[in-house]
Amino acid sequence: EARFRVGGDAIPLAQGQQIVVSTRLPGDAVRLDEAPVVFAGYGITAPERDWDDFKDVDVRGKVIVVLVNDADFEQPELDTFNGRAMTYYGRWTYKYEEAARRGAAGVIIVHETAPASYGWATVTNSWSGPQFDIVRENAAAERVKMESWIQRDVAVELFRKAGLDFEALKAQARRRDFRPVALPGASFSGS
């Protein structure tokens, strides 16, 4: 059970169809209730590349929505991340790790087939069952509660209901001066 809420409108999300929710924390389940939602571009902090999608924005306890891959995929001439070839910063593992370092409650990666290099079926087949991780001394400090993916059309609708333009923000996210954007009145609940 998962949903976005924007103002008084709920956007229900069916597991495996619009969203895939998972966790690598110990235990049977996790739950988020009305967590604020922030668009964090590509969710990358790479000081050696003079890139920081988070700037000084506090995302502790929030769900961040991020784009898959890195900024060069759609605009290889930027050459910030070595062109179209995906760097570690573009991988889902990095995005979850960086969000955990920043105290985010969850991460929602917007799935798009070309920049991910695989279709939605791969996401659902890979993330719909139990997830396993090594035993960690302090798993809660190293993992976000919720790791998830959503279909692009769900992201577009969410942003629209929040009064934002997904494509315009996606273009802004390819710039070094991008700053995270809170989705006005938007929250996420799910388990």
Descriptions of predicted regions:
Residues E1-Q17, Y96, A104, I109-W127, ...:
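Protein/peptide-recognition domains central to ubiquitin and immune signaling
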Residues R31-L32, R101, A140-V144:
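A short, structural micro-pattern
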Residues L32, D53, T93, W149-R152:
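A generic "functional-site adjacency" signal
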